Amino acid sequence: MTEKDADSGSDLVDAFLSDAYLNTEELRKDGPFSPDEFLVSKRFLGLDGLVNELSRLFEQVNNELMLLVKDNYQDFVHLGSRMKSGNTKVSTLISSIHRSEEQLKNSKQSLIGHSTEIQNNLKHKQDVENEKLIASNLLLLDQILKFLKSNDSSHPLWLESLNNAQRLCDTYKDHPWVQSISPTLINYIKH
């Protein structure tokens, strides 16, 4: 290696470490910052040099940020107060949402209670309807028995009435009144 080559290599190292090579203006170019492009442009710089350059750039950006805050302090304070006001509004909204959720839970519980009550009432109504049907059929059976008692077997509707009475007795055979009149019906069948 000649002295000229050594000087040339030394100049190259000096160029890499100089502010001319580590130009921060490239960070200010239009468009988004590309870490890949930055690292490719610094590929000949050693790791320590890259760390030093990044530390220096960080300090520079930090100082510029502080200068911006200092120059625009009133705007910065106003931004902080707007953020605080926004946080207050968000807190108010959150508490309103929590109250609404609680009201919805209470409404849901109330709705479930009303739904259960309605189902019970519908079941009771159905039971009452069934009882009315039983009572109506038992009244019909009583009328049929009175008809059978007051008419003899030669009447044209007598046999049909007897069959209807038997059908009703079979349907309600477990009812106490039907059990009590079964002997009477058996007597009519024997005639």
Curated annotation (Swiss-Prot):
Q: Which Pfam families match?
A: COG2_N
Please give, as recorded in its UniProt entry, the membrane topology of this protein. Peripheral membrane protein
Q: Where in the cell is it found?
A: Golgi apparatus membrane; Nucleus
Regions that span the bilayer: none
Question: What domain of life is recorded for the organism?
Answer: Eukaryota
Q: What do the Gene Ontology cellular component annotations say?
A: cytosol; Golgi membrane; Golgi transport complex; nucleus
Q: Does the keyword Aminoacyl-tRNA synthetase apply?
A: no
The protein's predominant localisation is Golgi
Q: Which InterPro entries match?
A: COG2, COG_su2_N
Query: Which UniProt key words apply to this protein?
Result: Golgi apparatus, Membrane, Nucleus, Protein transport, Transport
**GO terms, biological process:** endoplasmic reticulum to Golgi vesicle-mediated transport; Golgi organization; intracellular protein transport; retrograde transport, vesicle recycling within Golgi
> Subunit composition?
Component of the conserved oligomeric Golgi complex which is composed of eight different subunits and is required for normal Golgi morphology and localization.
Regarding protein family, the annotation reads: Belongs to the COG2 family.
Role this protein plays: Required for normal Golgi morphology and function.
The entry's protein name is: Conserved oligomeric Golgi complex subunit 2
Organism in which the protein naturally occurs: Schizosaccharomyces pombe (strain 972 / ATCC 24843)
> Lineage in the entry?
Eukaryota, Fungi, Dikarya, Ascomycota, Taphrinomycotina
Gene name, Swiss-Prot/TrEMBL: cog2
